[in-house]
Amino acid sequence: MGHQEIDIRRVIPAPPRAVFASLLDRSTWPAWSGHDAFELVRPGAAGPYDVGSVGLLRSGRRVMREEIVEVVADRRISYRLLAGLPLRGYRAEFDLAPTTEGTKVRWHSSFDAPPGLGWLYVAALRRFTGRLLDGLAERLRDRATTTT
């Protein structure tokens, strides 16, 4: 297995609190992320989307089972993939930082891919996550214009 890392950055025109809330509440993801559905399998210790929370994200026939492993309010959400892709040790973080334009989001993931397929998973995850972040930016931009 070959070790892979992906790093994607976007500036989202919304405050960190709004970006964080949308990323943490995975029940909203089908509206903007490119996923078809979300199902909460197990709530976290301190709330439905806190550390220990396990959920299923469906995209077509693919179902990914993910667990939230770290939450730092308005700053970071980390999760690990439990099932759904043939990757080992998959872990990803959304890191948030305020900017004058809104929130800088950094999505970083690392994993071990099957031999010869690392490039394919890097390309697919980079494309999918880029669209996810673009969808989030559009959702929050639309929300801001309807509330002002």
Give the positions of each predicted feature.
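Hydrophobic/aromatic beta-strand elements that line small-molecule binding cavities or substrate pockets
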Residues: 8-10, 64-70, 81, 90-98, ...
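A conserved amphipathic terminal alpha-helix motif
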Residues: 110-148
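A mid-sequence interfacial segment
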Residues: 93-119
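Intrinsic-disorder/low-complexity, polar/charged segments enriched in Ser/Thr/Lys/Arg/Asp/Glu/Gln
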Residues: 3-9, 54, 63, 76, ...
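Glycine-rich portal/gate segments that line the openings of hydrophobic small-molecule binding cavities
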Residues: 31, 40-84, 135-148
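Hydrophobic ligand-binding cavity/cleft-lining segments
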Residues: 1-45
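A short, structured loop/turn motif at beta-sheet edges
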Residues: 13-17, 69-74, 95-104
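Short, cysteine-centered beta-strand-loop-beta hairpins and adjacent loop/turn segments enriched
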Residues: 60, 86, 113-117
